[in-house]
C-alpha cells in the first residue's frame, strides 16, 4: 500500500481485522439507503466504489441488483472483502488500486464513502476528481461524503474525543481518540491510542496520528463544480458527468 501524505487510520493496514468493528455502525444502513435513493433517481445500473474498504457499500448494492466493482488501495481490507464475497457467494470483482489513478471502465456511478476523499491532499483530490470523470459514462454521477469545515466548531471538535471498548471473537480493543483542527489549512488531525488483547495474550499498544483535509461547501462548488448537500457536520456531494 502506498504511503499517504496525511497519514491513515491503523485499521487500513496494521489493524485491518478491526476495521468493521470501528467503522461500521448504526449510521451505515442510513448512508447506504441515501446512496441507493440517489442511484434510483439517476437510473443507475453499474457502480464503481473507488474506496470500498471491506465492502460495506458494494455488498449492500449488489444484493439490491446493482452491478458493482469494488476498488481500494489497501490490500489488507480487500482481502477481507474477497473472503466475505467467497463465503456469501456474492459475485463482486475487487481491484487493488488508487482512486487518484485507477482506470477500470465506464460506469453509471462512482462512489467513495466514509470520508475517503478527506485522506487526500488538495492536489490529490483534484487528481481524483479528474480520474473519476474518466471512469464515468456521459451523464454519470459521483457520490461522496466529507466533513463540513464550516460546521467544525471548537465544541464539535472537542466532542470528537472519545473512549471506547469493544469485545468480539475473543479480542478486546480499547481505543482513546482526540482531535485538533487547523482552520488555516482545513485539516482535522486525529490522535489514536489502542490497547488490543487477543484472547489471553499480552495486550499490545499502538499509537497513531492521521489528518483529514476538509472543505466548506462553497469550496467544493466553486473549485470542482460539485453539487452539494450540507447535513450538519457532513457534506454529501455528487458530480454530474455532463458538467465537468
Regions inferred by a protein language model and the residue ranges of each:
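A short SAM/SAH-binding and catalytic strip from SAM-dependent methyltransferases
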Residues: 108-124
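SAM-dependent methyltransferase
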Residues: 146-221
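Class I SAM-dependent methyltransferase SAM/SAH-binding core
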Residues: 55-101
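Conserved beta-strand signature within the Rossmann-like core of class I S-adenosyl-L-methionine
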Residues: 139-146
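A short glycine-rich, Lys/Arg-flanked "PGG" loop and its adjoining helix->strand segment in the class I
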Residues: 126-138
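A short acidic, Gly/Pro-enriched loop at the edge of an enzyme's catalytic core
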Residues: 100-109
Amino acid at each position: 500500500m502506498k504511503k499517504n501524505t496525511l497519514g491513515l487510520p491503523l485499521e487500513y493496514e496494521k489493524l485491518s481485522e478491526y476495521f468493521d468493528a470501528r467503522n461500521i455502525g448504526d449510521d451505515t444502513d442510513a448512508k447506504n439507503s441515501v446512496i441507493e435513493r440517489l442511484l434510483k433517481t439517476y437510473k443507475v445500473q453499474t457502480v464503481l466504489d473507488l474506496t470500498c474498504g471491506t465492502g460495506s457499500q458494494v455488498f449492500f448494492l449488489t444484493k439490491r441488483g446493482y452491478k458493482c466493482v469494488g476498488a481500494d488501495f489497501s490490500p489488507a481490507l480487500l482481502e477481507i472483502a474477497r473472503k466475505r464475497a467467497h463465503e456469501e457467494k456474492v459475485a463482486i470483482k475487487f481491484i487493488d488500486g488508487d482512486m487518484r489513478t485507477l482506470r477500470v471502465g465506464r460506469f453509471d456511478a462512482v462512489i467513495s464513502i466514509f470520508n475517503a476523499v478527506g485522506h487526500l491532499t488538495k492536489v490529490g483530490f483534484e487528481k481524483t476528481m479528474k480520474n473519476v470523470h474518466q471512469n464515468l459514462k456521459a451523464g454519470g454521477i459521483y457520490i461522496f461524503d466529507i466533513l463540513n469545515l464550516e460546521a467544525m466548531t471548537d465544541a464539535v471538535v472537542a466532542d470528537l474525543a472519545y473512549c471506547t471498548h469493544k469485545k468480539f471473537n475473543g479480542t478486546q480493543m480499547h481505543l482513546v481518540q482526540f482531535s485538533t483542527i487547523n482552520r488555516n489549512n482545513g485539516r482535522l488531525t486525529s490522535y489514536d491510542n489502542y490497547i488490543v488483547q487477543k484472547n489471553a495474550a499480552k495486550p499490545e499498544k499502538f499509537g497513531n496520528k492521521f489528518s483529514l483535509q476538509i472543505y466548506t461547501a462553497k469550496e467544493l462548488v466553486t473549485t470542482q463544480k460539485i453539487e452539494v448537500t450540507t447535513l450538519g457536520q457532513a457534506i454529501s456531494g455528487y458530480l454530474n458527468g455532463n458538467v465537468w
